[in-house]
Amino acid sequence: MIVIFLGPPGAGKGTQGKKIAKKIDLPHIAIGDIFRTIIKTSTSEAELINNYVRQGELIPNEIVNQVIKNFLLSFEYKNGYILDGYPRNLEQAQFFESFIKEKIKIIYFDVSGELLIKRILGRYSCKNCGKIYNRYFLQPKTDNVCDVCGSSTFDYRKDDNEEVIKKRIEVYKTETYPLIDYYKNSGNFYIVNGSKNEQEIAMDIQKILKIN
């Protein structure tokens, strides 16, 4: 089973992707994580990608498509995976379908712009285990101590400022809304209310995927 999580930045795709992937024992592949890993390398590709990220612009299709194809074909995912953040537009979707023949389920996270901004501005994660927190909605139970691993080192994303976030959301709308219309006619497109709390969203996704 291949499941695609669609939604704007801050919609909760990463949080739910990790949660659902663990429950059904499938890999969670997040395009954002892949590119952040590339950016940490000292290569011309990393510098090019980082320039787009800093300006709040989407990385060009030809770069995204090739990175994703190379990544997916370099591993054997016999039982499928959860793909988070790709495809983001119609061209990427058609490219994806050109080399992936398995049946796909698409889940779209519908969230208001105001809530998205708060989620992104407040977001940070444990450097050790990757657990995601939020200054507004989800703090560790003990100040500066990760609930999962006990680490006291956290990572705050440098590209998360309000001006860049608003631009990313607008760019996302322009790029991705035609893709939503495209998938609506596939028979495998589902919408979840991303404004609900984490547990409620997880339950909605489990119903769609028919898992307990």
UniProtKB/Swiss-Prot annotation:
Residues that bind AMP, according to the entry?
Answer: R36, E57, L58, I59, G85, Y86, P87, R88, Q92, R157, R168
GO terms (BP aspect): AMP salvage
Q: Which reaction does it catalyse?
A: AMP + ATP = 2 ADP
Residues given in the record as ATP binding sites: G10, A11, G12, K13, G14, T15, R123, I132, Y133, K196
Chain positions covered by the region annotation LID: 122-160
Pathway as given in its UniProt record: Purine metabolism; AMP biosynthesis via salvage pathway; AMP from ADP: step 1/1
GO CC, any one term: cytoplasm
Write down the InterPro entries for this protein, in alphabetical order.
Answer: Adenyl_kin_sub (IPR006259), Adenylat/UMP-CMP_kin (IPR000850), Adenylat_kinase_CS (IPR033690), Adenylate_kinase_lid-dom (IPR007862), ADK_active_lid_dom_sf (IPR036193), P-loop_NTPase (IPR027417)
Pfam families, per this entry?
Answer: ADK, ADK_lid
Keyword list, A-Z = ATP-binding, Cytoplasm, Kinase, Metal-binding, Nucleotide biosynthesis, Nucleotide-binding, Transferase, Zinc
Role this protein plays: Catalyzes the reversible transfer of the terminal phosphate group between ATP and AMP. Plays an important role in cellular energy homeostasis and in adenine nucleotide metabolism.
Family membership? Belongs to the adenylate kinase family.
What is stated about domains? Answer: Consists of three domains, a large central CORE domain and two small peripheral domains, NMPbind and LID, which undergo movements during catalysis. The LID domain closes over the site of phosphoryl transfer upon ATP binding. Assembling and dissambling the active center during each catalytic cycle provides an effective means to prevent ATP hydrolysis. Some bacteria have evolved a zinc-coordinating structure that stabilizes the LID domain.
Protein name as it appears in the record: Adenylate kinase
